Amino acid sequence: MSTVIEADEIRRLAIAHLFGRKAQSVTSVDLRDRSTLCDWFVLANCQSDTQLQSILAGVRRDLRKAGVPTLRSECAAGSNWGVLDFGVVIVHVFLKDAREHYSLERLWKDAPQEEARPEDFPLPKTEAQADEADDEGFESEENWT
């Protein structure tokens, strides 16, 4: 059985994993009624080229594990901007100066934009964590009488 993941769920997963990898100033831009390119842009900042490469590789791997393939990725070594294309969602990770320079938010100023907060986008639980959470509050069998 194949599961289709909706665009908003891919956006939410991408944002959660960006925060999980210490990205900053994460914003989503709703392009559903404005572009045929994709439904969402997700924009984020990072502190260094090393962090940029790490975030891109990690988010790509994390979403692949969730069943979301990357259609294309771009980021040359020493670059100040990287892109992950998940089809309906495109993730842009910038060094701060590059984000200000390219200003995609200004380019899409008429599109709804949302500044994401980490507490609104928790990382999904792994199966092991979910099993552990299911067991919380239960006495062990040793204590049954």
What is each PLM-predicted segment?
Residues 1-33, 50-57, 66, 75, ...:
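Long, contiguous binding/interaction regions
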Residues 33-36, 41:
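Active-site neighborhood of thiol-dependent amide/isopeptide-bond enzymes
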Residues 41-43, 83:
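Short aromatic/hydrophobic contact patches that present stacked aromatics
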Residues 43-45, 94:
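Short hydrophobic/aromatic beta-strand micro-patches
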